[in-house]
């Protein structure tokens, strides 16, 4: 009888221990705290880091939203920017100027986190090539961007985005333009770039958005552009 009581008592102790362990709050793996939005300066109520939640995207947004004009930029060519061998040689702190032929002026991303997903803050996406003969081959396109912080500085009225984008197109499309600005690696588009996803087919140049194909030469961009001028050639 004593043995049975001891056995029952032992079973009760084990059951109570298991119930206690299960009742304890489970601790999730701690996530790194987001970087502070103190970097950069807000623009029209949108912080430089935008609305991104993780550090990697916040850092990218701060780079996209730089408001300081480049000084003493170094010359770089369209061919050098899109060369896969240079993918690891550039840095986002690099100040450059590049002369390219403007193949197209397209709407920037809609409701991007860098612009706080706002409709009244939107980039202008400009595709440049090394020669007019490359127009239409999106695997050759290098992206440069006019951002909201610079659009007004360039004299464009951003109160109507479509009208502003058209004004930019009228001014620079089909011309040789010298762009000065900051280098930026937009890793978000690495899976749609010829230099980082060479196995993809090239997207058709039909003005529509496509997935699973390359619509640009490289994730490297000049973003933001902080000065531009029309020139006679490269």
Locate predicted features.
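Sec/Tat signal peptide C-region and signal peptidase I cleavage site
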Residues: 19-23
């Amino acid at each position: 009888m004593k043995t049975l009581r001891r056995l029952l008592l032992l079973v009760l102790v084990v059951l109570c221990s298991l119930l206690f362990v299960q009742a304890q709050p489970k601790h999730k793996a701690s996530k790194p705290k987001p970087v502070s939005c103190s970097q950069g300066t807000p623009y029209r109520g949108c912080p430089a880091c935008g609305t991104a939640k993780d550090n990697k995207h916040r850092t990218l947004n701060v780079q996209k939203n730089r408001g300081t004009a480049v000084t003493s930029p170094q010359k770089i060519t369209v061919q050098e920017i899109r060369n896969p061998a240079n993918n690891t040689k550039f840095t986002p702190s690099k100040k450059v100027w590049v002369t390219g032929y403007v193949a197209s002026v397209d709407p920037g991303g809609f409701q991007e986190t860098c612009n706080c997903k706002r409709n009244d803050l939107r980039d202008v996406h400009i595709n440049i090539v090394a020669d007019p003969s490359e127009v239409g081959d999106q695997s050759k396109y290098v992206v440069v961007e006019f951002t909201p912080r610079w659009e007004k500085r360039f004299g464009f009225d951003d109160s109507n985005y479509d009208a502003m984008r058209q004004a930019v197109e009228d001014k620079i499309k089909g011309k040789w333009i010298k762009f000065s600005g900051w280098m930026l690696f937009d890793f978000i588009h690495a899976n749609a770039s010829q230099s980082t996803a060479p196995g993809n087919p090239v997207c058709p140049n039909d003005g529509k958005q496509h997935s699973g194909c390359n619509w640009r030469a490289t994730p490297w961009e000049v973003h933001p552009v902080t000065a531009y001028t029309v020139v006679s050639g490269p």
